[in-house]
Amino acid sequence: MNIRPLHDRVVIKRMEEERTSPGGIVIPDSAAEKPIKGEVVAVGNGKLLDNGETRPLDLKVGDKVLFGKFAGTEVKVDGEELLVMREDDVMAIVE
């Protein structure tokens, strides 16, 4: 199944963080925080403005991004956990 976000929404796949502390302790899944970094896998066609025009999104597929830990809505597509959020919820592009 394909997922295509509407308007100013983007679909993001979380990027797994390191599961070992600087001291070498392995952090179990139950104690680890969800990553706030991810990769854009799909983008909508743009933000609908008040005047009826559509502004293209700044994000593109493949961008590595940072977002808030409570941003977006989690969805499962073909067994893969993804986040759907508005472009405004993305804080930065990691270059």
UniProtKB/Swiss-Prot annotation:
PROSITE patterns in the cross-refs: CHAPERONINS_CPN10
InterPro entries the record matches: Chaperonin_GroES (IPR020818), Chaperonin_GroES_sf (IPR037124), Chaprnonin_Cpn10_CS (IPR018369), GroES-like_sf (IPR011032)
Signal peptide: none
SMART domains per record: Cpn10
Domain of life: Bacteria
Subcellular location: Cytoplasm
Molecular-function annotations in GO: ATP binding; metal ion binding; protein folding chaperone; protein-folding chaperone binding; unfolded protein binding
Main subcellular localisation: cytoplasm
Keywords, ordered alphabetically: Chaperone, Cytoplasm
Biological processes annotated in GO: chaperone cofactor-dependent protein refolding
GO cellular component, one term: cytoplasm
Family statement drawn from the similarity comment of this UniProt entry: Belongs to the GroES chaperonin family.
Function: Together with the chaperonin GroEL, plays an essential role in assisting protein folding. The GroEL-GroES system forms a nano-cage that allows encapsulation of the non-native substrate proteins and provides a physical environment optimized to promote and accelerate protein folding. GroES binds to the apical surface of the GroEL ring, thereby capping the opening of the GroEL channel.
Database matches in HAMAP family: CH10
Complex and partners: Heptamer of 7 subunits arranged in a ring. Interacts with the chaperonin GroEL.
Name of the protein this chain belongs to: Co-chaperonin GroES
